[in-house]
Design a protein with these regions (language model features):
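Active-site nucleophile and cofactor-binding loops and adjacent substrate-binding regions
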Residues: 24, 46, 68-71, 90-93, ...
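Phosphate/pyrophosphate-binding loops at sites that engage ATP/ADP/AMP, CoA/4′-phosphopantetheine
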Residues: 55-66, 137-141, 184-194, 353-365
Length: 458
């Protein structure tokens, strides 16, 4: 049995690595950062070589052992015939592909696309990026022979294998999510060669998953039960499903889970902790200071509301042009009020996703919360109250990397399956109960997007 199981998460800001033992105890961690490029408004790119160098750096500082991978979803890496990268990767938060997303829905048919893939063709997804390259960089497009997603490029550099897991492939809009295979029908409609696509496997076979599936596994969600709530740069509410189902309006994402024969639905808001980072910079203060000032305000901050659409939105409003706003400002409001309203606004956005998951049949009685935003004690209390769910924190705070390490253990035979890995390695350390009634505030929040959309569009 290996002494260590290693998980690597190829994130938007850097690679995070963790090594654990067979009981889930953290032996070592490592991080390595890299830059994000925004060459034009709405664009978001990174150099795949930066991911590889960061992964090498982390692996050099971790004990040796089987390696599992997680990473940012939807990003497009294009390789030529010799396996070299042809251009910077286009990331999940890139918004340049509105025309191509609409083209996909027209060519496949929106209802058919949702039936096959469980999702609409959103601007951040992978397939619209390919069509954008075909339209805007035809010379480069003609050189493409392989496509990969971010974490799978790192695996390729480490092993030479061109492969992907069903969980991450689900976010390409090229994957038949019910059947857990590439969709020949969608690829034919879009004129995308099937031979460009990496071979797909179950996450437990290849020790890899998209970041949200890996993060959910890392907090113990292998089967239906608690929801996973992630307060990362983006915000996620995630529920495991025992069978494939989908929202005909595709207001939620439905993907394959990292557990075989299990699916998940999730709502994604594009600016959760991202909203906090932005406002902290504007206000010029630290987290503890702002939380303390916000504690002086009652829930609802005397009518101040924040619309958390700083980077467009996905759930429940698939709108890349959505923009954020504060409404209800008065001369009484200070920076503590702004901070609390922002925390509440993000929590309201998470509740949008929870309500849709309930419509799809999820019946959670609690949640597991993770992500950088969970460092704010006040935010934990607000999110629990807005969602109306007790929230639990797990002992491990390593998120997707921890889930990737569990997958490495399953692949290596340390654990019998994902359920065994969760039972042996995931433990909760704290429970936060709801304490405030936010139903009236949420009802007001739901009116914000329709009211703002007309004036907020560029």
């Amino acid at each position: 049995m290996p002494d260590a199981l290693v998980g690597l998460d190829v994130g938007t800001s850097g690679v995070k690595g963790v090594a654990i033992d067979a009981d889930g105890r953290v032996l070592a961690t490592a991080t390595a950062d890299y830059p994000l490029s925004r060459p034009q408004p709405g664009w978001s790119e990174q150099e795949p070589e930066d991911w590889w160098r960061a992964a090498e750096d982390c692996l050099a500082r971790l004990p040796e052992g089987p390696v599992g991978f997680s990473g940012q979803m939807h990003g497009l890496v294009v390789l030529g015939a010799d396996g070299s990268v042809l251009r910077p990767a286009i990331l999940w938060n890139d918004q340049r592909t509105a025309v191509e997303a609409a083209e996909i829905e027209e060519r496949v048919g929106l209802a058919r696309l949702i039936e096959l893939t469980g999702n609409r063709a959103l601007t951040g997804f992978t397939a619209p990026k390919l069509l954008w390259l075909r339209r805007h960089e035809p010379g480069l497009y003609a050189q493409i022979r392989h496509i990969l997603l971010p974490k799978d490029y790192v695996r390729y550099r480490l092993t030479g294998e061109l492969a992907i897991d069903a969980a991450d492939a689900s976010g390409t809009v090229l994957f038949d999510v019910r059947r857990r295979v590439w969709s020949e029908e969608v690829c034919a409609a879009l004129d995308i060669p099937l031979e460009w696509l990496p071979e797909s496997h179950e996450s437990t076979e290849i020790a890899g998953a998209g970041d949200q599936a890996a993060a959910a596994l890392g907090v113990g969600i292998a089967r239906p039960g608690p929801v996973s709530v992630v307060l990362g740069t983006s915000g996620v509410v995630f529920a495991a499903l025992p069978a494939y189902t989908h929202d005909p309006q595709a207001r939620l994402h439905v993907f394959c889970h990292a557990v075989p024969n299990t699916w998940h639905a999730m709502g994604v808001m594009l600016s959760a902790a991202g909203s906090a980072a932005w406002l902290r910079g504007v206000l010029g203060a630290g987290l503890a200071e702002l939380d303390a000032e916000a504690e002086g305000w009652e829930p609802g901050t005397e009518g101040l509301l924040f619309a958390p659409y700083l980077a467009g939105e996905r759930t429940p409003h698939p709108d890349p042009d959505a923009r954020g706003a504060f409404t209800g400002l008065s001369a009484r409001h200070d920076r503590g009020a702004l901070w609390r309203a922002m925390l509440e606004g993000v929590a309201f956005g998470l509740r949008d996703s929870l309500e849709l998951l309930r419509e799809l049949g999820a019946r959670p009685e609690s949640g597991r919360i993770s992500g950088g935003g969970a460092r704010s004690e006040l935010w934990l209390r607000i999110v629990a109250s807005v969602l109306g769910l007790p929230l639990e924190l797990t002992e491990s705070e390593e998120g997707s990397a921890f889930g990737a390490a569990l997958l490495a253990g399953v692949r290596a035979g340390v654990f019998a399956d994902a359920d065994d890995a969760v039972a042996r390695c995931v433990r909760t350390r704290r429970r936060i109960e709801p304490e405030w009634d936010y139903d009236a505030g949420y009802a007001r929040f739901r009116k914000l997007y329709p009211a703002l959309s007309a004036v907020a569009s560029p």
